[in-house]
């Protein structure tokens, strides 16, 4: 149906019906000074003129080299990935309830689940969550449901958990009677001191949350914390960067018995930064907990003719069947982002992922080492890290970051917002996209900025 503007008689009839004297009266709650009576739009232009105009405007953009990290990472995305993802079969797909008409999409999700289960060392994976923070919240709720032996709904969290993740976790669980205790980190190494866990030994916890690499980039003492948690009857929820698992041991190998649930942000694998989203969260677990897992799960089966097929499985957990008794009110998944991640992992393979992770670590190590050679600059913590490290500066870090932007460099994440003791600290992150020349430019820009602002 074509759009036909309303005639004056139709507008009058509408106003008379609702008892309004004019169209303006419909918007009287909007202050007059906020209304735009006319828009300053020029006359129409042709396609060539439009292309030239947009090209000129695009040239005004300045692309800084990004070293921020802190939960969102700049990695190279092979061109083939989004060329494939943008195909109509993927781009416009809907939840594959009708399995016989959705085998392609279902298989992609199944392959994703298989890869994520392999990467994390777990038995099962769901089809994804909204993002890393909501994946953690759902993992905590899942752990509480699964831990039938726990006598409380208390959860123990290491302080170096990503602060945004913690806020989302608190928001989602606010009215569910769940309590959180925080284990303070060691100021010398930026991670949880396992000996401090004994201060909580007399409290019954349903779950313990461990992030490694943690928010400050440090590798947690995952073995010690995991063993302590299991000894005291708690399930272990691991939060991790999937890229790090290409070179670090999987959560399944943490401690004597491994983590129970693994979650995190999948953005590093083929998903662009895109001003904060859309991203996707991943969640995997041991088979013992799979019936408490939220979200879609795709299974592989054989039909009556012996042909391999895929379908949504264990659907009795989900909202469209169990309604209020479902494991979660999430009734979707980030299918498009999952498709990108699946293609990314397929293209790179195990060796490619390991190479990306190794180069990211090496570049971060090089950047940190070179920065520490500058007078007044030092590496804050003396423990192992993956691809992020905290740097202490002789000046206010927020001022430093602002000045570095003038050098076309996003120098890092200002940590003063995270902790008052870190007002002169930034967290820097390097990945495989940063060249040796990029790192040299960062070092020279740092010297220049420190000289300019009195460092």
Curated annotation (Swiss-Prot):
SUPFAM superfamilies: PLP-dependent transferases (SSF53383). GO terms for biological process: glycine decarboxylation via glycine cleavage system; nucleoside metabolic process. One of its GO terms (molecular function) is glycine dehydrogenase (decarboxylating) activity. InterPro entries: GcvPA (IPR023010), GDC-P_N (IPR049315), GDC_P (IPR020581), PyrdxlP-dep_Trfase (IPR015424), PyrdxlP-dep_Trfase_major (IPR015421), PyrdxlP-dep_Trfase_small (IPR015422). It catalyses: N(6)-[(R)-lipoyl]-L-lysyl-[glycine-cleavage complex H protein] + glycine + H(+) = N(6)-[(R)-S(8)-aminomethyldihydrolipoyl]-L-lysyl-[glycine-cleavage complex H protein] + CO2. Its EC number is 1.4.4.2. Keywords: Oxidoreductase. Pfam families: GDC-P. It comes from the Bacteria. The glycine cleavage system catalyzes the degradation of glycine. The P protein binds the alpha-amino group of glycine through its pyridoxal phosphate cofactor; CO(2) is released and the remaining methylamine moiety is then transferred to the lipoamide cofactor of the H protein. Belongs to the GcvP family. N-terminal subunit subfamily. The glycine cleavage system is composed of four proteins: P, T, L and H. In this organism, the P 'protein' is a heterodimer of two subunits. This is Probable glycine dehydrogenase (decarboxylating) subunit 1. It comes from Francisella tularensis subsp. mediasiatica (strain FSC147). The lineage of its organism: Bacteria, Pseudomonadati, Pseudomonadota, Gammaproteobacteria, Thiotrichales.
């Amino acid at each position: 149906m074509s759009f036909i503007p309303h005639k004056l008689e139709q507008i009058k009839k509408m106003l008379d019906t609702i008892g309004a004297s004019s169209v303006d009266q419909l918007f009287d709650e909007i202050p007059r000074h906020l209304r735009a009576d006319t828009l300053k739009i020029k006359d129409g232009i042709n396609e060539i003129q439009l292309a030239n105009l947009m090209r000129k405007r695009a040239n005004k953009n300045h692309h800084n080299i990004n070293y921020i990290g802190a939960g969102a990472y700049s990695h190279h995305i092979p061109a083939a990935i989004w060329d494939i993802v943008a195909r109509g079969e993927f781009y416009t797909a809907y939840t594959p309830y009708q399995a016989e008409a959705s085998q392609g999409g279902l298989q992609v999700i199944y392959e994703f689940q298989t890869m994520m289960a392999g990467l994390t060392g777990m038995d099962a994976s769901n089809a994804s969550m909204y993002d890393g923070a909501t994946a953690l919240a759902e993992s905590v709720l899942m752990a509480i449901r699964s831990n039938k032996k726990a006598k409380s709904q208390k959860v123990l969290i290491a302080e170096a958990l990503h602060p945004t993740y913690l806020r989302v976790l608190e928001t989602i669980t606010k009215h569910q009677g769940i309590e959180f205790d925080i284990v303070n980190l060691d100021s010398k190494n930026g991670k949880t001191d396992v000996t401090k866990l004994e201060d909580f030994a007399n409290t019954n916890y349903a779950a313990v949350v461990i992030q490694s690499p943690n928010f400050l980039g440090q590798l947690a003492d995952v073995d010690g914390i995991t063993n302590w948690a299991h000894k005291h009857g708690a399930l272990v929820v691991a939060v991790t960067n999937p890229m790090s698992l290409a070179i670090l041991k999987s959560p399944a190998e943490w401690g004597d018995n491994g983590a129970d649930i693994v979650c995190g942000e999948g953005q590093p694998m083929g998903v662009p930064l895109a001003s904060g989203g859309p991203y996707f969260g991943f969640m995997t677990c041991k088979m013992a907990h799979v019936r408490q897992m939220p979200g879609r799960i795709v299974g592989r089966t054989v039909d009556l003719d012996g042909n391999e097929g895929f379908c949504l499985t264990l659907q009795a957990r989900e909202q469209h069947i169990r309604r209020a008794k479902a494991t979660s009110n999430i009734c979707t998944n980030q299918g498009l982002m999952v498709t990108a991640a699946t293609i990314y992992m397929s293209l790179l393979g195990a060796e490619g992922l390991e190479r990306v992770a190794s180069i990211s670590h090496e570049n971060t190590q090089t950047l940190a080492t070179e920065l520490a050679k500058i007078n007044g600059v030092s590496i804050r913590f003396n423990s192992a890290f993956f691809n992020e490290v905290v740097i202490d500066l002789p000046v206010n870090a927020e001022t430093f970051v602002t000045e570095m932007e003038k050098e076309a460099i996003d120098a890092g994440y200002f940590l003063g917002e995270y902790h008052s003791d870190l007002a002169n600290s930034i967290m820097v992150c390097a990945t495989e996209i940063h060249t040796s020349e990029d790192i040299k430019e960062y070092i020279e820009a740092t010297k220049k900025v420190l000289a300019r602002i009195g460092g």
